């Protein structure tokens, strides 16, 4: 076998008939498969052991030679080589054809490759190949022309007229003759001449022909290889035949297709031997051609060959195509050993990086490790006995199992894996039952719940795999989400409500104003009922300072006013973390505010009475605490805090006794008045409509707004009258579950419902759930529910497909180097829409490198120098100083090939540190954009029925429109000149508006539809590329009028708009990477003195290289213009044919790659996965493979076997060092 890790690239080409014969181990002559009695393969048949190898390991067909000692012997009786049966998966045979046939891919593809080489139409080719017309292959001295088509009648006439003065033929033989006659070099030279003058259609055709001919010329492929004399027979184990119970056979469709070819081929041979009449032979040749076509690509031409039940047979092409094809089913996604799946259940007592594994599962998954350990401990004499012991479930194996799984991480995965947090590593802990246990905080990343979800478990086997699982994939490392760098693990539901409840404050609770020495005393008082969790008390600050809490000297001498609950809550935080007394950023990042401290001797009860109540810690603030702890203390401390927060939350939410009863749903007294008023207003509107004062559309819009206002009024009243101790209010306020709109539906009114067509129905549901709905109202509600369900189902599929396309276009973007030394940057400002802030400047500069120094606009002093990573503190300074625009390093302007450099990328959001070389940022970017896709809406919004306002596409369709570079719906007209809007005139006759823009050198007039809404008025200054009307700019127009960078910037801003409007935060850098991939190609306009062809697409880097060498040699360089490709097109235009073929349009990609003799440099991830090579990202990068480990402080690890022992030793050493200091 070849070692895939040894080679650097892979080439594809056309196979000549000689090549096919050289692959073959013998000719298949008979259509037989296996003997129905002996079930042994037939001689010379499709499963022949002489050709393909033995069916049993180390055994010939007749049984004369058995066992490995005869390895390599060829049996003299049956002619079978003694070897492994595995060779039946790799040895090929061939069929010698009695007449040549054309390969359907090259004849039928669009454009027809044969047609381009021969300069003939596909229709003409079809007539020749399928024996409908003759073609002149050699005109001799006659008046005929080469390649002229003749019908049967015309052919006879010409034969009579000219005799043997010309040659004409039909079928693939004629095509092969013509292809052999093509002089590639001469044709290329002629076409290049023609290109100098040609225009229009003629030029396009010439460019396409030249492209194909040069491809043949440069690749060393010969055009006549598109016609075959022999066809390969793929190994039998890849087209198996298996016996079903009941004695019938199931076989791969390929065997049927091969049998048809062999039958027809053998019949043709016999007919030729018999010298049968030409018409019969011709018919048989045509049938052979059709049989080979069906084998290669069934259904491409004519009706597909069908099997039983009229099912089209799967040909070789279908084996590669689609989700079930070879690429996506077997090469990119394999089933793996050492894996299992089970239902998940909650494991509230687990630590963050643990999972519970059922005994039975662990025993099966860790069986080899168990057997080794049993033999090692001499509990079993050999592996066989150990296996028996495990199968018997002996009592003494369970302790061994406990030790085997200790410190051996396993991977858990939940489908659908939308982002990289869908697979994480945990340390297994044995549990009873058959369900796996998952830590409740890991649910959010997996989007898992415990209503019957299943998860898959995988065991990393090698030491390297285990080390990577532990150091890179352990759940504790996945605290921040890669899409925005905010914590993805944060307490939810019960945990939130528990922590909310413990930090609540109430006035006048029992024991208010008591002063305590330390937290232990507070806890004792609480447990004995002297104080309540919500009681405001005094606590000696010095006792907390002794434990490490940072207080100023002034604060240390005073008494801290807090509540009993907050004192207990603060115990879970790291020792030297500020004491949290209020949910504010100042308290979190600075110190506890001075206002909570009083002098000893003050009347504390009186002081407390005059103090306002401080709000409890809600879900958002808990998340902020986690982010801050992670930033300061990194992984271990954060994981510990999370577990403590979880335990405290569950404990306190249980103790709080939070319940919901019908009495908790309050009824609003003012509701009948509001409803009555709304009814009156609706009646007024109806009257106006009847009198013809308003149109039906206006009436509809007004009715909708009346009912929406009524609902809003009821909601506002509810909020006013809300009791803060109401359990439903507590749930929604803390962020544990539910929001104000749920509350309105329970005790206010349900309001308007959506109809299945997406419009809102005029009839509102006036009741709420507390009162109960009437039958009609229930019926109205059900419409909206169905719409919601269908929308969700469609959205999931659309979003998944978007993710797949995004991953495909960006999978080869990896951090390749530390600095690309670019001299360009990106100017960023806050993204706004009207008065609404979409993305503030702070978010855009955080975690990025500055390109130029940032100066204070007032004083001129430098806030942040150039080439520095902007941390939180610097970003805050920049924003506070009032800076509006910052120039940063960006993926848009990075010079690195096939990727990005560390400086242009900035911070790795998932770790909070600078990104490292090898990080697969392209895949992460694609997942970050695709994963929230399901949260986006599917709708196009109407502009509130404003006449003439086109629908604005939003949500998922808008994201697809931008990334696919489609013409946007509701397109805006842009100006092509910079200048002043001179006139805006209406032209009622033409039903248009005319806007004239006067530039310095040029004046343009734009004729706009009458209904379009203008963005400009007379006298406005406009810059080229600015929109004149309301709507979406077409980026393809923008790139023509402006430059690449402003187009990239426009796409970035537009994508951000969609996501941020829906409340989804995504970092700019992900969108930058995707947009850059859409703009990495240029189209050659004028080739100059280079060998590039006009109109071809080239990578920017290749284009620059070729131009550089042309300039060095003193030739005229080529000119090109940048091209914006949609992500699907960009993914297919990649340099890797393996990656493109496994994405879409498999046959087209492979046909093209073969003709060009393409070389796949194996730069991306996908192509390496396909050939089974280590991916060139992360620890698989070359850079990391050539490292010699350096021994540091070797005495630490002497005689240490487990990680826990190692940690103890290291701690011991540190303690010794500290004590000696």
UniProtKB/Swiss-Prot annotation:
Report the superkingdom from the record: Bacteria
- Which NCBIfam families does the record associate with it? rpoC_TIGR
Alphabetically sorted, this entry's keywords are:
DNA-directed RNA polymerase, Magnesium, Metal-binding, Nucleotidyltransferase, Transcription, Transferase, Zinc
Subunit structure, interactors included: The RNAP catalytic core consists of 2 alpha, 1 beta, 1 beta' and 1 omega subunit. When a sigma factor is associated with the core the holoenzyme is formed, which can initiate transcription.
Q: How is the cofactor bound?
A: Binds 1 Mg(2+) ion per subunit.
Gene label: rpoC
Which Gene Ontology terms cover its molecular function? Answer: DNA binding; DNA-directed RNA polymerase activity; magnesium ion binding; zinc ion binding
Q: What is its EC number?
A: 2.7.7.6
- The kind of enzyme this is, by top-level EC class, is transferase
Q: Which residues bind Zn(2+) 2?
A: 820, 894, 901, 904
Role, per record: DNA-dependent RNA polymerase catalyzes the transcription of DNA into RNA using the four ribonucleoside triphosphates as substrates.
**Name assigned to this protein:** DNA-directed RNA polymerase subunit beta'
A GO BP annotation:
DNA-templated transcription
For this protein, the record's InterPro entries field holds: DNA-dir_RpoC_beta_prime, DNA-dir_RpoC_beta_prime_bact, RNA_pol_asu, RNA_pol_N, RNA_pol_Rpb1_1, RNA_pol_Rpb1_3, RNA_pol_Rpb1_3_sf, RNA_pol_Rpb1_4
Q: Which residues bind Zn(2+) 1?
A: 60, 62, 75, 78
Organism from which the protein derives: Ligilactobacillus salivarius (strain UCC118) (Lactobacillus salivarius)
**Which reaction is this enzyme known to catalyze?**
RNA(n) + a ribonucleoside 5'-triphosphate = RNA(n+1) + diphosphate
